[in-house]
Amino acid sequence: SGISQDEKEVLDCMSVFPEKISIEEIELLMKGMDRLTLLKILERLQEGFLIKEVLVGWNVYYKFVHRIFQEYIYEKQSNGKKQLYHKMLAAYYEAQAEQDFTVLPLVVYHYDKCHDQVKAYQYQIRYLKEFYTVINENFPVLHTEASDFGDDFGVMAEAAKMLELAEDVINLKDDSREIRQMKMEMHYIKGRYDIAMGDYDSGIANIEKSIFLAQKLNAHKNLLACYKQQVFHGIQRE
């Protein structure tokens, strides 16, 4: 049998989430519907084997039974509608990220999907910086807390990802203040990595580019960090 308009609406909302979804998250996009009605719709969709319940502890989440069906539902919606949903969710997770940095990949995901490149890069940098630290020039060392996050976005927590991101940011044509700030950070990260790997010429060149941008932006903390790298490099070379 066919699905009702309300059921279709719930499936549309669910399709914009990358992973499992709580009822509170569905309610964000289904503002006009009360919870009991929504629960009944979710039950009917489960009976039709379109979605399933996932229990995490005592928390109930929902997800599509088949990824391919989720993609089909997603693609059938207008770009305007999808973009609006992604914007609403990006703002929601952005507010949550102040207390809980593990939602940052979701902020990145939704900003990326509504084509806000600057915000997507800003939050990706913030997320990766939360995860990585440089200890004794071994770049990067994963914080132990990273393992608590699970594997949903584990792929983002790789050194290769950070360096790829650095390249993408450095190659951006945009010259706004935010982008220059990000380029400054990425040159610094690349510089530290290169120096740690023994590629001193490239490392120092990146640190110098970071210094140039930091001076333009009056970013004193960043300048200090760059100068420290130059000092470490001098010590290492002797």
Where are the predicted features?
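Small side chains
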Residues: A166, H187, G191, G203-N206, ...
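Flexible helix-coil transition and linker loops at the boundaries of alpha-helical arrays
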Residues: E94-F101, L165-K183, L213-L223
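Tandem amphipathic alpha-helical repeat scaffolds
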Residues: Y72, Y109-C114, L128-E130, T144-V155, ...
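Generic leucine side-chain signal with a strong bias for well-ordered alpha-helical environments
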Residues: L11, L42-L45, L213, L217, ...
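Alpha-helix C-terminal capping/helix-coil junction sites
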Residues: Q46-E47, I195, I211
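Short, Lys/Arg-enriched, disordered terminal segments
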Residues: T144-D168, L172-D175, R180, D199
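Tetratricopeptide repeat
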Residues: V107, R126-Y127, A159-V169, G203, ...
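Short secondary-structure boundary elements
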Residues: S1-K161
